[in-house]
Amino acid sequence: RDQPRSRGLGDVYKRQLRLQNGLYIQRFAPMLRVAVPYGQLNANQVRTLAKIARDYDKGYAHISTRQNVQFNWPALEDIPDILAELATVQMHAIQTSGNCLRNTTTDQFAGVAADEIVDPRPWCEIVRQWTTFHPEFAYLPRKFKIAINGSQEDRAAIEVHDIGLEPVRNAAGELGFRVLVGGGLGRTPVVGSFINEFLPWQDLISYLDAILRVYNRYGRRDNKYKARIKILVKALTPEVFAEKVEAEMVHLRGGTTTLTEAEVQRVSRHFVDPEYLALDNVDYTALDAEHPGFARWRSRNTRAHKRPGYVAVTLSLKPTGVAPGDLTDKQLDAVADLAERYSFGFLRTSHEQNIILADVEQRQLHALWLELREGGFATPNIGLLTDIICCPGGDYCSLANAKSIPIAESIQRRFDDLDYLFDIGEIDLNISGCMNACGHHHVGHIGILGVDKKGEEFYQVSLGGNAARGASLGKILGPSFAQDDMADVIEKLIAVYVEQRTEEERFIDTYQRIGIDPFKERVYAANH
């Protein structure tokens, strides 16, 4: 408790201690990042977050792009009390920053998705237990992020992580994992490489251990901009890196890190299904006709569930005029109440900065929608242009070159017509305030990056990024734009898409078919 009151929190030792406990010193105040393992929370935990926002912050909390929760205005001397309150509901801020193994992320619909191959949550928990306080990997060359997908669709963006894992079955039906290494965004964006097409599940932790040992031994420590594992994999080549991992496996295979059926079952028991009722699917024809707003919301903000009679619901945190991913303390309390009444007391956060109620009875969906409208959670824009991923940017972050939130708001206001928004269809728009890419701009169908030009804020636009299966990095459109021009620029890009698209084509599909030139010509023709 005395440490926050002491000076020198920027000293090497104290800085490492501070960061590995999730505490940043930002532009105007400290920021505390709270760990939310694989995005799962219960109602009591959410109420505690609401209390912290109310008592120690300015009444807000923020969902990050790694499914964590951030408080942007705590006083430094209050941090020990905040951590103590978090501990009462089994929460902490350990390893949410620093050069260590960070929070393992996954699909926000894990365990309920209709297209799921294997529930990834037990594997996320196994990895979490292995990584937390791991003494060998507490001071890596640079931060390290792992994502695990469990479904046919990749909703965990595994191809742009330091390690990405996805379950597969061999010809005999045995479970294993495809293992990807060397992905990442930031200053040097890279789509990772698969180095193992079938890793037996028993060897999962041993293989991760081997990867980390190779990285810890050969990763650069002389230049933090060249220290991520993606730089090492590229320098060695994926093939040579894989050989070094296999050399480590000679010492690890069959050892103490080998997983057993008993251990996997022990962890899996914490992820049993709730007490689902035997329900039939609901025919919404009459309700949709009577309530067009409900029909519109249902088409965008719900997803098929593995159990008949249930549905997963996404609560949009992207209404016009609200910073993407922000919730007030009152909204947090309301979400906790909704989770208890509609979803067995649990909810999830997503890397798209929204909230999910994963187990809603279809017969209660209309009643839930009415409550979500009252709480400001029913904007029917999930997967659409205004469902913007956005970092806090220059309004908060000391690293940012430019503000992000005002850009998001200007675009939301320009595209506030729901009819037009639905006509445009699915599109990912991501905004980062600097090259660290916390807003994942590299993998947005449209990406926006804040840059500094002689002390003025400008914005660079990229097109063609994609975080899903077969990930791709966006291509820079051309010279950057002033803040006041950004909504016009996006409008011109959308106009090209609408003119050029064929039936059922998404923005990314049209871009991949016609290339960047038509977009570039339209945007810059009016500026020169």
What residue spans do the PLM features occupy?
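Short amphipathic beta-strand starts and helix->beta connectors
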Residues: 14-20, 47-58, 181, 213-216, ...
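Mobile "lid/hinge" segments at catalytic clefts and subdomain interfaces of large enzymes
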Residues: 16, 138-246, 442-499
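Gly-rich Lys/Arg/Thr-decorated short loops/hinges at beta-loop-alpha junctions or inter-strand turns
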Residues: 24-33, 187-192, 307-317
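Small-residue-enriched alpha-helical segments and adjacent helix-cap loops
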Residues: 29-175, 206, 317-456
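Terminal amphipathic helices with adjacent charged low-complexity linkers/tails
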Residues: 73, 77-78, 87-89, 216-299, ...
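Flexible helix-coil linker/hinge segments at domain or subdomain boundaries
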Residues: 93-98, 213-223, 252-267, 311-315, ...
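Long hydrophobic segments that form regular secondary structure
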Residues: 289-312, 319-347, 486-490, 496-499, ...
